[in-house]
Structure formats: C-alpha cells, structure tokens
Amino acid sequence: MLTDENKNLIWSEVADPVIKPDEVLVEVHAAGVNRADLLQREGKYPSPEGSPQWMGLEISGVIAELGPEAKAKSSWQVGDKVCALLGGGGYAEKVAVRYDMLMPVPKGLTMEEAAILPEALATSYLNLFIEGRLEAGQTAFIPAGASGLASLAIPLAKAFGARVITSVLSEDIAKSISHLGADVIIDSSKENTADVLEQQMKAGFPVNVAMDCLGGEMLGQSLPFMTNGGYWIIISTLAGVT
C-alpha cells in the first residue's frame, strides 16, 4: 500500500521481497498502525535507507522461507508464527525481516493482537521498566491516555503493580479509557494538570516515572511534582517542542 499525492492509501503491485542470507520471509497476517505510519503518510517520516517506501513498522505472520544464515544461527522454522519490527513495508502480503528482529507469537494471542507487540507494546515496556525503572507501588504519569502508546502503557504499568495517573482532553475521553485501569484520570478541559499532580504529591504520590509523548508545556507544568531521582522520558513532542 502506497500513498498518492493526496495522501490516500492506494493498492499497488510490487515484487515479492528477496531475502538476504540473514533474513526470513514472512507472510503477513496483520499489521499495526503507529504514529510513525501517520507521519510517513504526510511525508514527515521517511523510511530508513534501504527499507521499502510503503508503510508498516510492525507485523505478525507466518515464516515462509529462511535464508541460510538465518537458518544456521536461529531456531526459526517454516510455519512458525511470529511478529516482527520493520524499517517499513509492513502493509504488504510478504516482508523480509532479519532473523533477530522476530519474536514468537505468544500462546493465546490472535495475529491481530500480536501485531502490536514489536513496536507499541515494546516501546511502553522499554520506557517504563528499562529506562524508567518503574517498580510496584510507585507512581507513573502517562499523559495522553487515549493515545495508542498510553492505551498499552497504562494497563501494563497496572499489571506490574504501579499506580497510574493519566490525562485526557475531555470527559467523554475520560469515560472511554476508564477500563484501562488508571487510578487518576485528569480531564484537562476541567482540571489543571499541574494542580492535580500537586494534590497527588501532597497525598503521598509523587511521580516516579513519566512517559511523555506530548512534550510542549507538559514538562514545565509537571516536572516539579516528580520524586527525587525520578525519570521523565520524552518519547515524542506531539504538542510541540516548547
């Protein structure tokens, strides 16, 4: 799938990828939709050099072929169900992927569910628990609660025993994400984010880890309510740089 001059997705016939020795050919069953895909559609996020020029960063599917190096250095086999992180090209019937960029589809997950593991879920896990060192009993602030990343990061943090504060733009959005399990949902149309974070800090819940995909004024408003030694992780600047 490619984009025309009007930024619409169009079907296009392309040749099947030819795998390199260290690559695996995967027949695609499902693909994730990420912010990067939307930006690429607008011409603001070019694919890495050497990657297909059509969209798609994460997929799930079934291995159809292995290069000789991939076969020798891995335990992957034809027919294995996998999900993969790509430089691009996931919106296609087949993709070529390095063997070490694959993960097995966990038992119990559908292909559609597995397609969000390599980029969306992995980003949330990496930033909360590896970069941010979030632990059970600590507080995570995850603004933009209805975003793709936050909708995964919130239940992920809760599953590991953390307390979660998030923010949204309206009461309707707050209701729509209530099932994610956040302890505090800030409706920024009615409440000031900094005021709520200050109240939480005074109640004994300073922010240990913030996973921020907004940027803009969010950092200045909220940084004073971080605990000493806390982690503020900026993933994106959707609300601007300053």
Segments predicted by a language model, with ranges:
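Glycine-rich beta-strand-centered segment in the early N-terminal region that forms part
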Residues: 15-32, 44-89
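NAD(P)H dinucleotide-binding glycine-rich loop of Rossmann-like/cofactor-binding domains
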Residues: 39, 70-72, 81-144
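Short, well-ordered loop/turn sites that connect or cap secondary structure elements
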Residues: 75-76, 134, 226
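Short glycine-centered segments of the SAM/dcSAM-binding site in methyltransferase folds
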Residues: 81, 139, 163, 230-231
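Glycine-rich NAD(P) Rossmann-fold beta1-alpha1 loop
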Residues: 121-122, 144-151, 212-216
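Adenosine-nucleotide cofactor-binding segment
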Residues: 142, 158-221
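Surface-exposed amphipathic alpha-helices with a cationic face
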Residues: 150-159
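Glycine-rich phosphate-binding loop and adjacent beta-alpha segment
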Residues: 177, 217-242
